[in-house]
């Protein structure tokens, strides 16, 4: 299984995160990718290549052009405005406010942000582009006939919606990969999100589309980030009616329960007729993850990989979350072992 990985992820190295009323070192940091890369190499997945550079043709089909222009220019505009720290949103277009987009950078950050823990820092745009490129190259491998590939993306992407960033995400890598597969000739693609946190950005992008089935297994949004999407009754709209499946689960969920949701989601994906599955892989379902509340163990990730691989369709694994403990590398490697058989 080929691994696509860009060293440019290091350009995204924010120093602050708003968490629990404090500015703390971010949970989403460069060492995450280094731990994962070392572990997958040690597990034998050592065919690691850097992605090619890609333009915006594919990403413009899933993200708003104005939003992408904002991301590209935000840091320079923030500094030009005289602000000293990293760019953190402080005001938001909440209920019953104007739909107009502000012209100044402070207002625009609030307009395009869905979660204030995520600062924009130097190199954010460049790192996001490199992460997107890893997803595109992974999709190209699947389109070329590979049975599986791993896009070791950082920063992650599944909280990035059509025109919003947050949850450490800026460009939705899984969505871009799915779009790339469609552009290469596929008619139906599934995105299976196994991160602890609901893929609200991915749902936002595909909720009214009928060519991508989105399934998400996640912590109940009544008590877990991102809070405002991810309920079971959200099943799609218009052309996308019936193409979203949410599986919210409560505190302490073990694999015995989580695995039942996985099995059901794969049945739904098979009924949809997906020609490939993009797996949004977060290992923050791990029992020791510092910002989650599921109870999966390291061996469970091998079972997870085997179960997904049993679907029989090509798999592109795209890295999402998993924080704070060295076992994130082992757990990712275990998923790949399960996929590889």
From Swiss-Prot:
Binds 1 zinc ion per subunit. Keywords: Hydrolase, Metal-binding, Zinc. The record marks 323 as: Polarizes the scissile carbonyl of the substrate. It holds the Pfam family Hist_deacetyl. Optimum pH is 9 with acetylputrescine, N(1)-acetylspermidine, and N(8)-acetylspermidine as substrates, and is 8 with acetylcadaverine as substrate. GO terms for biological process: epigenetic regulation of gene expression. Zinc ions inhibit enzyme activity in a dose-dependent manner. Inhibited by KCl at concentrations above 10 mM. Inhibited by o-oxyquinoline in vitro, suggesting that it is a metalloprotein. Inhibited by various substrate N(8)-acetylspermidine analogs bearing different metal-binding groups such as trifluoromethylketone, thiol, or hydroxamate, and by hydroxamate analogs of short-chain acetyldiamines. Zn(2+) binds at residues 195, 197, 284. Pathway: Amine and polyamine metabolism. CDD domains: HDAC_classII_APAH. This is Acetylpolyamine amidohydrolase.
């Amino acid at each position: 299984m080929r691994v696509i990985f860009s060293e440019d992820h290091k350009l995204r190295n924010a120093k602050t995160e708003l968490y629990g009323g404090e500015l703390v070192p971010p949970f989403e940091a460069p060492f995450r990718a280094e731990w994962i890369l070392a572990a997958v190499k040690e597990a034998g997945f050592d065919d690691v290549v850097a992605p090619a550079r890609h333009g915006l043709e594919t990403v413009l089909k899933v993200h708003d052009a104005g939003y992408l222009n904002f991301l590209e220019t935000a840091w320079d505009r923030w500094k030009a405005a005289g602000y000293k720290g990293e760019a953190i949103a402080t005001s938001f277009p909440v209920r019953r406010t104007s739909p107009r987009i502000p012209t100044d950078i402070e207002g625009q950050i609030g307009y395009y942000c869905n979660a204030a823990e995520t600062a924009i820092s130097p190199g954010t745009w460049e790192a996001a582009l490199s992460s997107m490129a890893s997803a595109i190259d992974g999709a190209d491998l699947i389109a070329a006939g590979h049975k599986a590939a791993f896009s070791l993306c950082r920063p992650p992407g599944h909280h990035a919606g059509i025109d919003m960033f947050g949850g450490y995400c800026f460009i939705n890598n899984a969505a871009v990969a799915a779009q790339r597969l469609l552009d290469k000739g596929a008619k139906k693609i599934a995105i299976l999100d196994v991160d602890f946190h609901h893929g609200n950005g991915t749902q936002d992008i595909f909720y009214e589309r009928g060519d991508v089935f989105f399934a998400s297994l996640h912590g109940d949004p009544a008590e877990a980030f991102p809070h405002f999407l991810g309920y079971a009754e959200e099943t799609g709209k218009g052309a996308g009616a019936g193409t979203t499946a949410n599986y919210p689960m409560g505190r302490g969920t073990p694999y015995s329960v989580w695995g039942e949701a996985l099995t059901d989601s794969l049945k739904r994906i098979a009924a949809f007729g997906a020609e490939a599955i993009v797996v949004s892989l977060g290992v923050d379902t791990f029992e020791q993850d510092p910002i989650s509340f599921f109870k999966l163990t390291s061996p469970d990730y091998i079972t997870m990989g085997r179960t997904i691989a049993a679907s029989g369709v090509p798999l592109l694994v795209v890295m999402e979350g998993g924080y704070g403990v060295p076992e994130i590398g082992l757990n990712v490697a275990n998923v790949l072992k399960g996929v590889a058989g």
